[in-house]
Amino acid sequence: MCDLLAALNMKTGSTLIVVMMLSFSGLGCIHTNSGVGGAEESLNTDTGIFVTGPDGESLDIPPLPLEFVFSDVGEEGAEPSIGITSSGCIFFIAFEKVMRSCDFGQSWEEVTGPECSFTTSDPYGWVDPVTDRIFNVQMQGLETSWICWSDDDGESWLGNPHDSGTTPLNDHIKLATGPWTSSGYGIGGSLSQSFYDQAVYYCYNKGVGIFCFTSFDGGATFEAGGQIFGLATSNGGLHGAITSAPDGTVYVTPRVETPTVIVSKDNGFTWDEHSMGEDVGTPYPRKNSEVATDTQSNAYHIWTGGDEGVYMSRSIDSGETWEQTSIRISPKEVISTTFPQVDAGDPGKIAITYLGSENSSELGKPDIDGENWTGNAHYATTNVSYYLYITFSLNALDS
């Protein structure tokens, strides 16, 4: 997950700037030819830049004058996570390693402590934006997860090798933090704030169900919580990350046919489901959907639609209601997408990344199963080239 925000001042509806980067065939890691730990400035080009409206159609508006610097740290690391502390240090977690850069990505060093796991089945990382606590989560088979944490930019660590709630068999592990509320688990949280200021959440799949736990001791243990009841227990399980808003609202996205967000207002004690996106649906098999919240707790839910474009629905009342007319994020020229991610800053300022392809000539040709390819990235052959698309909007709340 990348924190990418840029300035844009438009007055005509929600406007999106899309920048296309780094071509490669197939799905997986993006590779460059520069040395490990170095940084490479992206090439300037007049192609691969789109300015679109909420329908994915092009607008006659000049793009932002953006410059990008890329680092190849961890380019072969599976399922990476990234976070930034208030000191400006960047933490990149993949496989069992925690890599740190305090010079804007120009150089990197490994800072994994002996209190952290030396093996992994699935990694995940999180930086608490309020306390700067760095969490390194390493799944140990399907039985449990080993979580270690640092409060001094990775100089020292503490850890718990069995730190994944009360119920074993976990997969698709996620961790996040957020403020305590005044109800549910928040009542106990108000008493534990002297130990750690924030609630810490740990969620995972068990079969097709979602389990979520809340920690009262800064992530050292997860004793409160269990299976989320409702749609998420019987249809798809967890696939997106956990998101917590500044007002304490928590969001989890299930892997279901109709785009859905599961919301808690009491630090994970109870959960409600909210659906949207019936106008665009989802593909099969269904992939990641994600939620981001801005500094005023407006929520932005993105997912891959049934036509393989990336779509968004917004909530301006802390997840109580969601717009039912979906906004297209990806340009119409992009006919296949996967792995969308979103982040938000000040109100209306969002950044989205995803992998996408414009190889429309491959539509209808045999896919990996020998069927006519419809644009579903899950079935794409190596003849389909995917790019990293980076999308910006400064007025994502406009109608």
Features from the language model and the residues they span:
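Secretory targeting signatures
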Residues: M1-T47
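Extracellular, repeat-based ectodomains that mediate carbohydrate processing or recognition
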Residues: E40-S399
